[in-house]
């Protein structure tokens, strides 16, 4: 079948094309195919030609052929769609009024709930109902109150006194600005100079708990304000801040020069001024600090004999294993002071408090005749006591 006998190719239809496709056919970028090409695609499809063969013979992309045929089978039209057009307007005045009415009745109503209600009340159908994003945009632009309008007086009672003070202090705009926080809330704030002066006074009167509000030489100079120190002392203090925090080998081995003696004397004179400033910055007084810190506490001295005779509650007295000897008398004499050491052999008190109750916290076990029968228990091994007291 010869398709190009009575039908011109797209190359001869238009001039000034935008490009050439993969099949060698020309096209104008962004514009639809001519109606004659569309009609020829439909005619070939009616003749039973496959879409891939139509695409190859007419030099039109396969996607374009499929799209044109699909639209023709659905609608019966070969006309192209609207290029650059928009959807029909769904936010009609009636729909906007209904959305505003729903929002006034229930301010916490979601956009999807408004959309479902519009469909339920037959205000819109499935084709004309606005989307959720469109409803949110309508509420934001047409239903809600614009920000430049004053807030009703009834909403002022919600704001507490503390929050009003904080909001007015945070706002840096002028009092007449409608876009500031004070302008939106209808709060008349004082002038900027008054706020700045109050902020400066608040910095001086309320330091942070550790006594240092802002580090650095500039802030320290601002706090001094030339009242506590002379100009010479301020220069010395500046040199101290400029000096390195860690001394190197040259500064540690270098002797003090004569011209540095005046500097050190001036630094010594800073002690009084720094003490006064620290007393003003710190919140508690030195007397309160001294009273809160406990003084030195005395602890009783435990001698060697008392330590040996002391046993922890719930534990048996210490018995060294067999074969381990005790300290001799000369050794104990060197370890214990003479006033505490009597010279008698080191012995342990009798085992009068030693029983089986410390090993068995459950009293029911002690009631068994097995633990109290001499045959079952047997005699205590005397080797431990003999090794303990043999000296």
UniProtKB/Swiss-Prot annotation:
Gene Ontology molecular-function annotations: DNA binding; DNA-binding transcription activator activity, RNA polymerase II-specific; DNA-binding transcription factor activity; RNA polymerase II cis-regulatory region sequence-specific DNA binding
Signal sequence bounds: none
Subcellular location per the Swiss-Prot or TrEMBL entry: Nucleus
Coiled-coil segments: none
Disruption phenotype: Mutant mice fail to produce small pre-B, B, and plasma cells and therefore lack any immunoglobulin in their serum owing to a complete arrest of B-cell development at an early stage.
Location of the DNA-binding region in this protein: 16-142
Entry-linked InterPro entries: Homeodomain-like_sf, PAIRED_DNA-bd_dom, Paired_dom, Pax2_C, PAX_fam, WH-like_DNA-bd_sf
Annotated GO biological process: adult behavior; animal organ morphogenesis; cerebral cortex development; dopaminergic neuron differentiation; embryonic cranial skeleton morphogenesis; lateral ventricle development; negative regulation of DNA-templated transcription; negative regulation of transcription by RNA polymerase II
GO cellular component, one term: nucleus
Post-translational modification: O-glycosylated. Phosphorylated by SYK. This phosphorylation plays an important role in the abolition of BLIMP1 repression by PAX5 in order to trigger plasma cell differentiation.
Annotated function: Transcription factor that plays an essential role in commitment of lymphoid progenitors to the B-lymphocyte lineage. Fulfills a dual role by repressing B-lineage inappropriate genes and simultaneously activating B-lineage-specific genes. In turn, regulates cell adhesion and migration, induces V(H)-to-D(H)J(H) recombination, facilitates pre-B-cell receptor signaling and promotes development to the mature B-cell stage. Repression of the cohesin-release factor WAPL causes global changes of the chromosomal architecture in pro-B cells to facilitate the generation of a diverse antibody repertoire.
Name of the featured protein: Paired box protein Pax-5
Organism: Mus musculus (Mouse)
């Amino acid at each position: 079948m010869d398709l190009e006998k009575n039908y011109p190719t797209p190359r001869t239809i238009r001039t000034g094309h935008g490009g050439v496709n993969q099949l060698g056919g020309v096209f104008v970028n962004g514009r639809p195919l001519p109606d004659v090409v569309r009609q020829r695609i439909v005619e070939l499809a009616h003749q039973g030609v496959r879409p891939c063969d139509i695409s190859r013979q007419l030099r039109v992309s396969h996607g374009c052929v499929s799209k044109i045929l699909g639209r023709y089978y659905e609608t019966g039209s070969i006309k192209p769609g609207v290029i650059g057009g928009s959807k029909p307007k769904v936010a009609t005045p009636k729909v906007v009024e209904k959305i505003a009415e729903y929002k006034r009745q229930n301010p916490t109503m979601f956009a999807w709930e408004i959309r479902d209600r519009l469909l339920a009340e037959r205000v819109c159908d499935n084709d004309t109902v606005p989307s959720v994003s469109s409803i949110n945009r309508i509420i934001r632009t047409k239903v809600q109150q614009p920000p430049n309008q004053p807030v009703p007086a009834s909403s002022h009672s919600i704001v507490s006194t503390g929050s009003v003070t904080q909001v007015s202090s945070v706002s840096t705009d002028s009092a007449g600005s409608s876009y500031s926080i004070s302008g939106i809330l209808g709060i008349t704030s004082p002038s900027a100079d008054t706020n700045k002066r109050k902020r400066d006074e608040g910095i001086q009167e309320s330091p942070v708990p550790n006594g240092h509000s802002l580090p650095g030489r500039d802030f320290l100079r601002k706090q001094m304000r030339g009242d506590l120190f002379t100009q010479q002392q301020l220069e010395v203090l500046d040199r101290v801040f400029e000096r390195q925090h860690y001394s190197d080998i040259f500064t540690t081995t270098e002797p003090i020069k004569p011209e540095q003696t005046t500097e050190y004397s001036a630094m010594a004179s800073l002690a009084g001024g720094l003490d006064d400033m620290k007393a003003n910055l710190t919140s508690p007084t030195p007397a309160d600090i001294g009273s809160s810190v406990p003084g030195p506490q005395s602890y009783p001295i435990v001698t060697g004999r008392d330590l040996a005779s002391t046993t922890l509650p719930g534990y048996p007295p210490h018995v060294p294993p067999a074969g381990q000897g005790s300290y001799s008398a000369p050794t104990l004499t060197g370890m214990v002071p003479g006033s505490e050491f009597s010279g008698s052999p080191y012995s342990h008190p009798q085992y009068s408090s030693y029983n089986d109750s410390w090993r068995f916290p459950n009293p029911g076990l002690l009631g068994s005749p097995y633990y109290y029968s001499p045959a079952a228990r047997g005699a205590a091994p005397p080797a431990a006591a003999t090794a303990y007291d043999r000296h």
